[in-house]
Every structure is written in C-alpha cells, then in structure tokens.
Amino acid sequence: MMLTRRAALLGLAGAATIGASRAPADPDVVVIGAGSAGIAAALTARAAGLDVMVLEAMDRIGGRAFTDTATFGSPFDVGCAWLHKADDNPYTDYARAEGFTLQAHEYDLERVWLGPEPTPAHLVNEAEAAMSETITDAPADVAASTIVDLSSPVDEAAGDYLGALDMAVDLDELSTFDYANADDLAPNLLCAQGYGSIVVHRGRGLPVRLNTPARGVRWDGPGATVETDAGSIRARAVIVTASTGVLASGALRFTPDLPVATREAIADIPMGMLAKIPLKIRDQRFGLEPFTDVLLARRGRRDLYFLSFPFATDLMVGFVGGDLGWELSAAGEAAAVDFATQGLVEMFGSNAAGAVVKGGLTPWASNPWTRGAYAAASPGRYGAREALSRPVGDRIFFAGEALAGGLIQTCGGAFRSGEAAAAAVRAVLT
C-alpha cells in the first residue's frame, strides 16, 4: 500500500495534545468524524461555550483531506488538493496567516491527446464550456447524458472531463440540477505543503478520540447516546459528518431508525469516485512545465488526466473518475499504475515507461470510513441534499461535503457545513 504510517505523522501530531481528561465524559455535543466538517463543527460549538467530544474512526484527523509526506519524498495530497473558490474559502486566510505556501492554479486543459493524436486543447475547453452551459440551463433534473451530444471524440472528451474527472460520476449518473446549483469554484489554489496539512493544522488540539468509530446512535430518549467499542457516550446533540457512503452502508446504526425521508435522502446522494494515480518520474519532464494540465482522452470513457509536476516535484499525478475510477480502484494499485504508465507511453513514447520509478493509488474506494471520493446526487434527486440537511428530532444533525450548498464536493464547503450544523445545535441547546 502506498500510504505509510509515517505519512500520518501530521495527523497524529495534531492528536498528540489530546488527552481523555480534556474531553468531557458526557458532553453537550458529540461530533462523529474529524474531517473538515467535523473540525469546523467542533471549533464552532466550542466557541459557543458547548462541551464537545469528537469521535474519529481512523488513526488521524483530516478525513479525506490527507497529505502523505513520506511515500514520494514530497507532499502529496491523497484527497482534497485544490482550495476551491479561494476568495471565499475558510482555509485560505488561515493558511496564509500560518505560513503555508499557496499557488494559483486553474485547471483549463493545456495539452490534449485524443487517442494517440495531439489535439489543440482549446477545442476540448470550448466544448466543455458549451456543455456546461447546456447542463446548467436544463429545465428538468435529468441525467446530463440525455441532453448533451457526445457523438464526436472532442465532445466525448469534454463530457468525461466535466463529469467523471470533476463531478466524480459519468454523465449518465450526473444530475443536471446538482451540477447547475454548484458554484463556479474559481479562483483555485494549491498548497505546497498540502491541503491536508492545512486541515490538520486547523484541527490541532481538539478533543478527538482516534481509532474510535461510532457504531450506533440511540435517540429514543432525551438527548442521544453514541455507542462505541469503548462504551457509550451521552450527549444533548450529535453532529454526524460521516460520508453518505458510510451512512448508506449501515456501519452507523440509528435506534430508532432515521425517518424515511432521511434514509431516502442518504440513498439518493451516493458516493462518486475520483481516484489519483501518482507517478514519480526520474530524469524526465516530457517537455511539460510544472502545473501543466494534460488530458489523454480515449473513446469509451477511459480518460486519464494528469496534473504535471506540481511545485516542481517529481510527480505526475494521474486522475481517473466515475466508473473507470471504481474499476481501477477495484483492480488494485498495480493495475492502476500500469494504466497510468501506459497513458504516458501513448502520449510521450515507449521510453516514458522507464522514467516511472514509483506509483500509487488513492484508497478512497476501499476505505471503510469513506466508501468513495465525494457525493453526487442521482438524476432527479437533487432535493435529497436539502432533505438530509434537516435535523432529526432536534438531536441529530448532519454535515459534510454532501450538504455544502453551492460548495458541494469541496473541503471548504464541508467546513462551512460543519459550522452551520454547530450553529443549528447552538440554537437548539442555548
């Protein structure tokens, strides 16, 4: 597995200040999950004077914001990488104030191959812009594939870049309303030290119990009881930041069952897949400048995107999404690295394979505490996001990237959702 124990040092360093004595035995609020939404919820609730305990199933904080600093000899964001909508992102000013290095980077394609043939990148960029407008203007919430023309290689490439490689689902699984109601995420920033490092830094010192998955939530009496392998915790309210994939799996039981509308909403916002295949390159740059955006487009939804050598590191970071992302995640690291390496060969010739000295595959599909990359509403089910955001019995509150309004599928949006959930809890409890 590409992710090493040393890679989690930043997360554990943040947790090193945590002691059982610092977390109240029966807090006002239990927050389930110490990702971006959970960190924001805990910070906001504590600022409101509420006692908080955070339960985290993994051995680190940060959730899907995780920077691996060991595997490749330079920071690699296993999950969240771009600070989207940077002028309104809750991490931007914080990162600058704390000395993180930020670099503007939009992801307009600069180099494109349609199969083995180099193609002017502007053709795909223009086709994607036109397709985006068509989907945004859709009068009904339907699958995006039903209203766009994908007959030409350029249009198919644009559709894959817009759908699988951005929204984490192919166009036949993309809700037009879900897409239309997502914000324009420009401007975008990347962080030299890793976005995950920023998130962990912001969450340092919170009362988090690591390696403590919540197994159940009982809400059949006053307040709620959260059940863990180490015992039960009574609280006046619970903020649940687990992904919709985890919620749908039944790994977190609710007693009594959640209302039908809530359960249906969870099912209607399934997890999509965007997997990264980082390749470490030796003594070669393929004529690419750092941060160059490259797309190898193949017919049949087999597209591969690369972010080239960010911050002048030795990494070509490959991305695959949608059904292909799930397929390669199931096939495993060796198959994924071979797929990405062969992509380099198609674009740059047979010698490219010899330049690859190490590769990896991000684990979000197989991680039982994520079960996907980020959530995408099913066609016709855009309203499920609002339905899931409603509190249950004024005791159970949901938060996360799936409930981030216009900032769905983003780390900054998850933070805003956590803040909102904590504010709603405060309104009920105080």
Predicted feature residues:
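FAD-dinucleotide binding site
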Residues: 9-430
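N-terminal secretory signal peptides
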Residues: 1-3, 14
